[in-house]
Amino acid sequence: MNFDINYFKETAYKIFNIDSPSGYSENINKVLIELLNELGYTATLTNKGNVALKVVGESSEKTVATSAHVDTLGLMVRSISGDGTLKITRV
């Protein structure tokens, strides 16, 4: 498999620009499933609302699992001080 830097940049830009605050990941999950399916994987949505993907390896002697989060930091700017410092609060 060759690494396509342009595909990587375009895909990263696409997913990084999807709003996905904690508890509201439906939009990013939909896009991730579409992208993974386009790559030939079978991605599904679990009952808990997570994207699941199984990749069969060359050997069944070892099993590897990994996970990642897709939600973004849910903060709101409360005020901006005179020196440019941000005062934030949780959303």
Regions found by a protein language model. Give the residues of each.
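N-terminal hydrophobic/helix-forming segments and targeting peptides
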Residues: M1-V91
